[in-house]
Each structure stands twice: as structure tokens, then as C-alpha cells.
UniProtKB/Swiss-Prot annotation:
Post-translational modification: Contains 2 disulfide bond.
Tissue: Expressed by the venom duct.
Keyword hit for Secreted: yes
Keywords from the UniProt entry: Disulfide bond, Neurotoxin, Secreted, Toxin
GO cellular component, one term: extracellular region
Superkingdom: Eukaryota
Any one GO MF annotation of this record: toxin activity
Positions of the pro-segment in this chain: 1-2
Domain notes: The cysteine framework is XIV (C-C-C-C).
Name of this chain's protein: Conotoxin Cl14.10
Compartment annotation: Secreted
Amino acid sequence: NERHVTCFYVKFGCKHTECITTIVFCWQTASDISSV
């Protein structure tokens, strides 16, 4: 089984290049997903 982790970055409160909060969503994907 190959397991892959995908991450998605969401930034909030950005002024120019400075951001107040960065939230990272990560989830695993597999070739044989039996339950979600």
C-alpha cells in the first residue's frame, strides 16, 4: 500500500508578505480506502 499525505495551506490576515495565521490541512490518501 502506498500512502500519500497531501497538505493544503491557508493563510489569513495577510498584509504584503506578513501573515497573521497560517492553517495547514493535511490528509492521507491510499489506493485502497475502505472507510472515510
